[in-house]
């Protein structure tokens, strides 16, 4: 038996012998499915549907995922992976490492193709200092940004307004990642890989 639920389902409300499957269509987390003990295969799973193909990530035992400095590439795991608690499994499957032990971003030295994460090429990586950010953005000819924030407080709309002058006239679109790296506030300016 299965029960469809909202993707924001409180995991604590799920009986311990039931499986929770988080389903995303592309990068949009759409639903959670609870599987009864008779149908359950694992405690959780992430399913990502891309162009008609179904990709599933299951829990798997393995070595602890290393934590290190950000690399040349950054993986932003699919929301189905993060909700299912399978970031470590994704890291082991892709040969990547975490940039902070409490944050879901993963790092790589080379591009990684996986349906379970968006891979970004890192153009600039350094400690988070808002006062220096405008100069870093201008130096890269960035004119518009998608801001991703994990592990740091702050209002992305306020930051976007503060960066408006730095973004004026730039020709490149980028993703600004505000996060933590090895427990330090960190900023990465990235483009799609």
PLM-predicted stretches and their roles:
Residues 2-193:
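SAM-dependent transferase fold signal centered on methyltransferase-like domains
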């Amino acid at each position: 038996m299965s029960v469809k639920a909202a993707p924001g389902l409180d995991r604590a409300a799920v009986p311990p012998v039931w499986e929770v499957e988080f389903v995303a269509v592309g990068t949009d987390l759409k639903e959670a499915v609870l599987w009864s003990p008779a149908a359950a295969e694992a405690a959780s799973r992430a399913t990502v549907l891309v162009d008609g193909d179904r990709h599933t990530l299951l829990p798997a035992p393995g070595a602890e995922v290393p934590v290190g400095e950000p690399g040349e590439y950054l993986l932003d795991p699919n929301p189905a992976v993060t909700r299912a608690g399978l970031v470590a499994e994704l890291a082991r499957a892709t040969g990547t490492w975490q940039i902070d032990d409490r944050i879901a971003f993963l790092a790589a030295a080379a591009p990684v193709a996986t349906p379970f994460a968006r891979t970004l090429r890192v153009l600039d990586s350094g400690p988070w200092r808002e006062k220096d950010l405008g100069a870093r953005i201008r130096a890269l000819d960035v004119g518009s940004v998608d801001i991703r924030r994990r592990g740091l407080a702050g209002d992305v709309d306020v930051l976007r307004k503060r960066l408006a002058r730095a973004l004026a006239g730039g020709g490149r679109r980028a993703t600004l990642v505000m996060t933590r790296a090895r427990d330090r506030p960190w900023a990465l300016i990235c483009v799609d890989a």
